[in-house]
Amino acid sequence: DHVGSYGIVVYQSPGDIGQYTFEFDGDELFYVDLDKKETIWMLPEFAQLRSFDPQGGLQNIATGKHNLGVLTKRSNSTPATNEAPQATVFPKSPVLLGQPNTLICFVDNIFPPVINITWLRNSKSVADGVYETSFFVNRDYSFHKLSYLTFIPSDDDIYDCKVEHWGLEEPVLKHWEPEIPAPMSELTETVVCALGLSVGLVGIVVGTIFIIQGLRSGGTSRHPGPL
């Protein structure tokens, strides 16, 4: 079975924040950009198969904002409980120095859905090569979000995903740097070479013994028996 879902997310504090998304089997197909007032497809191929009028999403957002205002007044403007989000950073592909790759910052347990995610390279903010998804709804009605950073791994660079949210007392930094095998020390190299030489010598000695035994066996079998 396949599941398609669409929905709106609206939050006020104090400005209006919202989004309209459409998902299929848990994957986002498109969202409506509220500033540009246009439909943004996650893959260009999707736009060739179907279309969606962004005005429909904008109308739903307007309705959601109105309903939220009514509910806020009825609750005497009681604020929502802020949850502390959790972040994880990992590469999209196995890391090879000098080969282009993508870092992914996965932020889960977001509530309310208002968050700042920033990439840092060597403690400096990075803007180029950054892409961020809209919010995805979890089963418990919290949210998760992904931020991507295209980069070229180098042993001189370290990266951090900086997460800022009302549920955190201070920004959280999730650190990542390429894992480069430590070079062998001179002592280790000497031991490895000595072991390799020893194994080689043992092989030569054992081989020589087998050859001698084979020659002796062959010589014995060639002696003629009694007439």
From Swiss-Prot:
SUPFAM superfamilies: Immunoglobulin, MHC antigen-recognition domain. One of its GO terms (biological process) is adaptive immune response. The keyword Glycoprotein applies. Gene3D superfamilies: Class II Histocompatibility Antigen, M Beta Chain, Chain B, domain 1 (3.10.320.10), Immunoglobulins (2.60.40.10). Disulfide bonds join C105-C161. The chain crosses the membrane at residues 190-215. GO terms for molecular function: peptide antigen binding. It is a single-pass type I membrane protein. Residues 1-82 are annotated as: Alpha-1. CDD domains: IgC1_MHC_II_alpha_I-A. Belongs to the MHC class II family. This is H-2 class II histocompatibility antigen, A-U alpha chain. It comes from Mus musculus. The gene is H2-Aa.
